[in-house]
Amino acid sequence: MARMHTRRRGSSGSDRPTADEPPEWSDVDEDAIEERVVELAEQGHDPSQIGLKLRDEGVQGTPVPDVKLATGKKVTEILEAHDAEPELPEDFRNLLEKAVRLHEHVEANGQDHQNKRALQNTQSKIRRLADYYRGDKLDEEFAYSYETAREIIEE
């Protein structure tokens, strides 16, 4: 499948091994994993960072290779169940942060045409994602602009 804003195709990579149950060496209790997920979310970590921390550091010293295999729920589902989910979806927030950084860079460096184009592409992705999340995770009246993005990021 081609990429969104280029004519090139994506690079292929290896797939995650298919597994129906967690490995024997990772025998952590589901409740302990959920507690650790909520604890990390309260510390301000994003769902992807929580997954990385559980993979690297683990719970009680035992790594958790896959939260969904161990608990039957995704990290975001655990956060929703404990009312600890972030206000905005992680992918949307990351795009807003990128757009704010690019906008400030383009303001300071007006001749940087490559990053002007990158800003346009990022804004296009934000508008597409806003259409997807509008009504569910975003307000119905949400419209992207640099000012609204900066306000959201500064919160």
UniProtKB/Swiss-Prot annotation:
It holds the Pfam family Ribosomal_S15. Signal peptide: none annotated. It comes from the Archaea. Residues 21-33 have a biased composition (Acidic residues). Residues 1-10 have a biased composition (Basic residues). Residues 1-66 are annotated as: Disordered. The keyword Ribosomal protein applies. Residues 34-45 have a biased composition (Basic and acidic residues). Gene3D superfamilies: 4.10.860.130, S15/NS1, RNA-binding. GO terms for cellular component: cytosolic small ribosomal subunit. Keywords: Ribonucleoprotein, Ribosomal protein. GO terms for biological process: translation. One of its GO terms (molecular function) is structural constituent of ribosome. Belongs to the universal ribosomal protein uS15 family. Part of the 30S ribosomal subunit. This is Small ribosomal subunit protein uS15. It comes from Halobacterium salinarum (strain ATCC 700922 / JCM 11081 / NRC-1).
